Amino acid sequence: ITGSNSELLSGEMATLISGRYYQINIYPFSFAEFIQYKKEMEKTDIVDLEELFEEYVEYGGMPPIQQVAAEDKYSYLGDIYNTILLKDIITRHNIRNTDMLNRILDYVIMNIGKNFSAGSIVKYIKHEGRKISKDTILDYLLYAKNACFIYQAQREDIKGKKVLKHNEKYFLVDHGFYQAKYGEMENMEYILENIVFIELLRRGYD
């Protein structure tokens, strides 16, 4: 069974097929996989690593966009984002206030790799003259996590080794979604942190 929605194997489905499946998490191309793909497509072992890294940073590693013309890549990423939003979040959870969901995900995308809390988003929404509860925000974030669109990195007290429940960091399954939305390279440190975080997940770290 495959799909973008992790709930496919987490709730009632996991109960139905208990003991009959092995879950494998599939992520977008790593940089190493991206290089290998380019070599195979161009039928050469000679590549410009610096040039390829710039391309990888700018557009991400989603496999479907690799054969799309450069001028259409952001648009294609936008289509993927809208599909995840519609099928895996809005439709599945019967969300009516889709604009509010969009604003919350915009905030998360804009702040990848930064510490923030549900309270931070409440203030952000309030600044726009609107209201939303922390519980609703936490629900929306959970839906996005279950759709494998975002991943949460909790803070840990190094001395006590306790997980801190406030000001977590969130990362995107693919940094290309940030670039497609904002197209800015000035936040390079956060984009690189996102790349490293997903690579750690890819290697089995939680």
Question: What is each model feature region?
Answer:
Residues 1:
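Glycine/alanine-rich phosphate-binding loops at beta-alpha junctions
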Residues 4-6, 10-115:
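Interdomain motor-coupling "hinge/lid" segment immediately C-terminal to the ATP-binding subdomain
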Residues 70-206:
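Accessory nucleic acid-recognition modules appended to NTPase machines
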